Amino acid sequence: MRLPTPLYPGTLVRRYQRFLADVQLADGTIVTAHCPNSGSMKGCNLPGSLVWLSKSTNPARKLAYTWELVMADGFWAGINTGLPNRLVREAIEDGTVTELQGYGSIRPEVRYGEERSRIDLLLEGEPGRCWVEVKNVTLVEGERALFPDAVTERGQKHLRELMEMVRRGDRGVIFYVVQRGDGEAVSPADAIDPKYGQLLRLAVANGVEALAYRALVTPEEIRLTERLPVIL
């Protein structure tokens, strides 16, 4: 997936109120950008970090700039949680994600489950139905990419919904997109959200599949490249 052009380099001043970030541009101007990430962004929100911003041409937008990338531990990390669904869909359609081939259609944001969630991607075709929930991963400690970076009741709900879909005879997949170049495997962040880790292990034990792929992240493009192991 090509990123919007041009992107604007800057230095992070601070991230606050979850969805706001002050950034100093190359000319010294400080702008307030939209932060499209509701997590804690642990490890990706350090003041002084190099960042890239996109800029909207829509004059009606309150904030023209959107924070897209940050340099974290020597690697570009994609912090925009609105992108992973598109990345996964593109990677399914171009054959990169071999585990999710053979389906004739892909539909986004389909309502499902007893808790009335919206699934990120519903795959339908000859193999049946496959419900795919996508998660963005930017927290890396040592060689392990960890999810979530904050307590996520919504993420817990999604695991329960996927278990229910599997119980009904469909396929359920939790798909982790590691939007940075380090981290050799994905694991639940038990120290941050132990209940999520417990539910993930329970879900996998009950037939939910856990997939993880690394994304190549540059200021020009982001795309999925290789599968990573999920270690529970």
From Swiss-Prot:
GO molecular function, one term: DNA binding
UniProt superkingdom: Bacteria
N-terminal signal peptide: none
Family annotation (Pfam families): SfsA (PF03749), SfsA_N (PF17746)
Family: Belongs to the SfsA family.
Protein name listed in UniProt: Sugar fermentation stimulation protein homolog
Organism from which the protein derives: Geobacter metallireducens (strain ATCC 53774 / DSM 7210 / GS-15)
Organism placement in taxonomy: Bacteria, Pseudomonadati, Thermodesulfobacteriota, Desulfuromonadia, Geobacterales
Gene designation per UniProt: sfsA
